[in-house]
Amino acid sequence: METTNFGFVASLLFVGVPTIFLIGLFISTQDGEKSSFYSDSSKGRLGPKR
């Protein structure tokens, strides 16, 4: 069943990639808030554009 396997892989990628991105974004913001756009959007005193 190649079609079922392809559908499983496609759904797994469709769910897994945004999940991994959100987990990485959450870890990067928790770790000293190194994420520039998240810090700039939440509190505007940190200006990465000097």
Swiss-Prot record:
InterPro entries: PSII_PsbM, PSII_PsbM_sf. One of its GO terms (cellular component) is plasma membrane-derived thylakoid membrane. It comes from the Bacteria. It is found in: Cellular thylakoid membrane. Its main location: membrane. It is a single-pass membrane protein. One of its GO terms (biological process) is photosynthesis, light reaction. Keywords: Membrane, Photosynthesis, Photosystem II, Reaction center, Thylakoid, Transmembrane, Transmembrane helix. Belongs to the PsbM family. One of the components of the core complex of photosystem II (PSII). PSII is a light-driven water:plastoquinone oxidoreductase that uses light energy to abstract electrons from H(2)O, generating O(2) and a proton gradient subsequently used for ATP formation. It consists of a core antenna complex that captures photons, and an electron transfer chain that converts photonic excitation into a charge separation. This subunit is found at the monomer-monomer interface. PSII is composed of 1 copy each of membrane proteins PsbA, PsbB, PsbC, PsbD, PsbE, PsbF, PsbH, PsbI, PsbJ, PsbK, PsbL, PsbM, PsbT, PsbX, PsbY, Psb30/Ycf12, peripheral proteins PsbO, CyanoQ (PsbQ), PsbU, PsbV and a large number of cofactors. It forms dimeric complexes. This is Photosystem II reaction center protein M. It comes from Prochlorococcus marinus (strain MIT 9301). The lineage of its organism: Bacteria, Bacillati, Cyanobacteriota, Cyanophyceae, Synechococcales. The gene is psbM.
